[in-house]
Structures are given as structure tokens and as C-alpha cells.
Design a protein with these regions (language model features):
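Surface-exposed amphipathic alpha-helical segments in non-transmembrane regions
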Residues: 120-122, 128, 166-171, 208, ...
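Short, charged interaction patches at domain edges and termini
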Residues: 199-216, 231, 240
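Conserved RecA-like helicase motor-core motifs
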Residues: 9-21, 173-183, 232-234
Length: 241
């Protein structure tokens, strides 16, 4: 759709497109064409932002820049800031004046504002303050306990049972000192994968021996319970995605 709009707006301009539909070998060829033949417009996904250094690029635009802020991951702000600063940094690299235009529904968001200014210190202060408030790493550890199975109702009921078990276990003195908190269950961001539904609980606590042993016991106990036949339970620590 964006390519169609660009061709209507700039019918005489050459446009190159680089995204997942172009082959890996084609990426290099596209970039060489963009640089060598001075094709004025390069349209692409996030891959365009990373590691490209063209001195004649003077204008960069980012569409829906804040979408990645609202994914269910504690690193969302950091990743969005990193991506936007890379994009903004593509313009004006050869001594020419550069300009970046960022489309956003939340122009007052600290991440967007700091990225537009390339203000790393201000972003760090804002992000570290938010992580401390929410008990995100590095101030605590996040363990995602996911239950999966083919019947959504059973999966949800099992996840509720896992939550209650976790809350009981976290009352033990060796765990309570870390002020653990159990959240959920909630559907995974992509709730159904390969015909299996996924619901998960989140344990906020410390990555210490007592916690690891408790989670290992939980996995074994879940697996041997006949009520959980056909379902799986797995644990991620500070999950990247």
C-alpha cells in the first residue's frame, strides 16, 4: 500500500523495495543499486535501518513508529528507541543536512521524543525509572510460565491451577524474602500456535537457587499429573520475545 501511494505521489521517481519478500542475495543487489544508480526512494521494513551508511540520504521517514512500544515484553521501549535512533541516524551522514520524519500516535511518549532527539541519557533515565517502578530487570527477574494444549478451556484451567500453586510455593520463607509476585494467567501474545493454545503466568522475583529449584519442581509435578495429559508447561527467564 505504501509503495502504491509513493508511486502516485512521485510517478517519475524510481522506487526500490527491500523486505522479507526479497531474497537474501537480492538485498545486497538492491542496496548497491540504491547507492550506485542514485535511485531516490528506498522503501523497506526494519532491515533498512540497520547498518546502512549512504552519504546521499537526506530524508528518512518512519511509519507507525510506536507499534513496537505496545508488544508484551519489558524490552519494548528499549527496542523501539534503538530502532528509531538507527533510522534517524541514516539521514545526513555525508556532511549534508538530514531530516527524519516520524509518524506516531503518541508524540508525547518519552521513547519517541528521546529517539527523535537522539538523547540517550534522557531515555536511560526515563527507562530505568520505569523499570524500577514496575520491577522489571535489572531490579527483579521475570519468569514466564506457559501452559499449552489443544483444548483452550483445559489450558486456561490448568494455568489458573499453576498460578495458585505458584502463590502457595512463594509463601515459603526461602522464597518470600525476594518479595515474589505471581501475575496472570493471560493469553500469550499469539495465543494459538500449531493448533495449540497458550496461556501464561508471570513470576516476578529473584533468579536464585530457591526459585530455580521451585520452578523445576513445578515442571515435574505438572508433567506427572494425569489431569494435565496432552498439555505442556515450560518456563522462560527474562524472555526476549
Amino acid at each position: 500500500k505504501v509503495e502504491e501511494e509513493l508511486r502516485e505521489l512521485f510517478p517519475e521517481a524510481g522506487i526500490l523495495r527491500m523486505d522479507a519478500d526479497t531474497t537474501a542475495g537480492g538485498h545486497e543487489e538492491i542496496l548497491q543499486t540504491f547507492e550506485r544508480e542514485r535511485v531516490p526512494i528506498l522503501l523497506g521494513t526494519q532491515m533498512v535501518a540497520k547498518g546502512l551508511d549512504f552519504e546521499n540520504v537526506t530524508l528518512v521517514g518512519v511509519l507507525s513508529a510506536d507499534i513496537s512500544l505496545y508488544v508484551d515484553n519489558y524490552r519494548a521501549a528499549e527496542r523501539t528507541f534503538s530502532l528509531l535512533t538507527q533510522v534517524v541516524g541514516r539521514a545526513g551522514r555525508g556532511g549534508k543536512t538530514g531530516r527524519a520524519v516520524i509518524q506516531t500516535y503518541t508524540p508525547g511518549n518519552d521513547v519517541i521524543r528521546c529517539a527523535a532527539r537522539q538523547d540517550y541519557d534522557a531515555f536511560y533515565e526515563s527507562e530505568i525509572r520505569m523499570r524500577r517502578l514496575r520491577r522489571y530487570p535489572p531490579f527483579a527477574d521475570l519468569f514466564t510460565v506457559t501452559v499449552s494444549g489443544t483444548e483452550e478451556g483445559r489450558v486456561l484451567r490448568a494455568a489458573v491451577s499453576v498460578r495458585e500453586t505458584l502463590r502457595q510455593l512463594c509463601r515459603r520463607p526461602e522464597l518470600a524474602a525476594g518479595e515474589p509476585e505471581v501475575l496472570g494467567p493471560a493469553p500469550a501474545p499469539v495465543v494459538k500456535v500449531n493448533n495449540r493454545f497458550r496461556y501464561r503466568c508471570t513470576l516476578v522475583g529473584k533468579n536464585d537457587k530457591a526459585t530455580r529449584e521451585m520452578l523445576a519442581w513445578l515442571q515435574k509435578d505438572f508433567a506427572k499429573d494425569s489431569a494435565n495429559r496432552g498439555m505442556n508447561l515450560f518456563v522462560d527467564h527474562n524472555a526476549a520475545d
